[in-house]
Regions:
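Glycine-rich phosphate-binding loops that contact phosphosugars or nucleotide phosphates
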Residues: 54-199, 312, 319-323, 330-337
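C-terminal hydrophobic structural anchor segments
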Residues: 304-364
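Active-site phosphate/pyrophosphate-binding segments
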Residues: 18-30, 37-49, 54, 177-298, ...
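Glycine-rich, charge-decorated loop segments at or immediately adjacent to ligand/cofactor-binding or catalytic sites
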Residues: 138-148, 265-268, 354-358
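Actinobacteria-biased recognition of intrinsically disordered, low-complexity terminal regions
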Residues: 1-19, 390-394
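A structural-propensity feature for long, helix-poor, extended segments
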Residues: 104-111, 115, 278-313, 322-329
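Short, small/acidic-rich helices and loops at N termini and domain boundaries
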Residues: 379-394
Length: 394
């Protein structure tokens, strides 16, 4: 039996308050404020001193868990024009080439995540420049201080790295801009904050589901086994974040991919048992839907495969590559429709790549949170994750 979300519960303030014990929706709505505050905190901490103000030979970023996307975003933004390579590491071992000429960025909201902390400590031992982002008075801050690096403290009160993404990402983007690795200075960051504010307003809890894009998306996602697909590198990062949020926040297992590489992999799943006409040869008996089934009492008979397509804004400079990418996206969507896959699309609005990405992340973050609440779950509290930590705490 597939999950089912009654849109009435998403329009009930009491239901939302009862299940959102740690105010995840409120925290997500502060994303724009996080950007503005992080700019101020970065300037106060001396962000211009990163790597001694000199361009490093390379940049390595360590982040994981809810902040994993920080490394992915920097890699995405820097790749087109960065004069130095940017790489990602989640844990040790640190590559052998990292040394005094390189910059290592370690991100952890608590300042205690083992991977980034170990990477920062090893980088400091080798004499690399350090930029760390996380809690003040934390082990990560101490490692950075001993290495005479720059530590950007996040504002107090943040309890979840998933909901504090922009407090963690903004200093890293600003530092990369200062070093000439990408073009995303304060003007772009303030524009990003404004875009995040617009999405927070559109996705606010008291907005009815028929006008709230995140609630509407959550209702559609509820009865599916979701596959999140980005139409290119930018939305590939957004897709990875969305799949993570669906799994960790809404407790719905989700996979993700990026076009063009994942096209065959994703489309092959349309032949499987979770599509209306799929499952040929899979040992699944096909039958017509029960017209007497009550969705409130019986629930949907079987979860359907769902394709959440994240699409970029139309290109302002037409090219053959852009036309081919759009044609491939359209072909995947048509194939999904023909196979009986439930298709959902989130289209980015025009703007700087970081601004476009912010909008995509905001909408899917809110949708995953509403999906958890609609299913009667607390988006911030997972008993099984708590059990896992208890069993592995050494």
């Amino acid at each position: 039996m597939a999950p089912y979300v009654d849109e009435a519960v998403l329009n009930d303030p009491e239901h939302i308050a009862a299940h959102d014990s740690r105010d995840t929706l409120v925290a997500l709505a502060t994303a724009g404020a996080q950007v503005r505050q992080a700019i101020t905190l970065s300037r106060e901490a001396g962000i211009e001193r990163v790597a001694g103000g000199d361009r490093p030979r390379s940049v390595l970023v360590a982040s994981l868990g809810g902040s994993a996307v920080v490394a992915n975003v920097l890699e995405l933004l820097a790749e087109p024009g960065s004069p130095v390579p940017v790489s990602v590491r989640r844990n040790l071992p640190l590559p052998g080439w990292v040394g005094p000429l390189d910059l290592v960025v370690a991100v952890s909201l608590s300042g205690r995540a083992r991977g980034p902390l170990a990477v920062a400590a090893e980088a400091a031992r080798r004499g690399a420049s350090l930029l760390t982002v996380g809690a003040a008075d934390s082990p990560l801050a101490e490692v950075c201080a001993r290495a005479r690096g720059v530590h950007i403290a996040v504002a107090r009160g943040a309890t979840s790295s998933r909901a504090a993404l922009w407090s963690l990402l903004t200093p890293v983007v600003l530092a990369a801009h200062e070093l000439g690795l990408l073009e995303a200075g304060e003007a772009v960051l303030f524009e990003t904050a404004d875009r995040l504010d617009l999405h927070a307003e559109a996705c606010r809890p008291r907005s009815e589901s028929f006008v709230n894009p995140a609630k509407a998306l959550a209702i559609q996602l509820a009865e599916t086994i979701p596959v999140v697909l980005g139409d290119g590198p930018l939305n590939g990062v957004a897709a990875s974040r969305a799949a993570s949020m669906l799994s960790r926040t809404a407790r719905i297992p989700a996979t993700c991919g990026e076009l063009p590489d994942a096209a065959s992999q994703i489309v092959a799943s349309f032949d499987g048992p979770f599509t209306a006409g799929g499952g040929r040869g899979a040992g699944v008996r096909e039958s017509a839907p029960d017209i007497f089934a009550d969705p409130f009492l019986d629930g949907p008979a079987q979860p359907r495969l769902g394709l959440l397509m994240l699409r970029d804004a139309p290109s302002t400079t037409p090219s053959r590559e852009a036309d081919e990418a759009e044609a491939l996206t359209d072909a995947v969507l048509q194939t999904a429709h023909d196979a009986g896959v439930r298709v959902m699309t989130v289209l980015a609005e025009p703007g700087h790549p970081l601004v476009r990405l912010a909008g995509q992340i905001a909408q899917t973050d809110f949708a995953a949170t509403y999906l958890a609440i609609g299913l009667g779950l607390d988006p911030a509290v997972s008993p099984h994750v708590a059990d896992l930590w208890d069993r592995t705490r050494g």
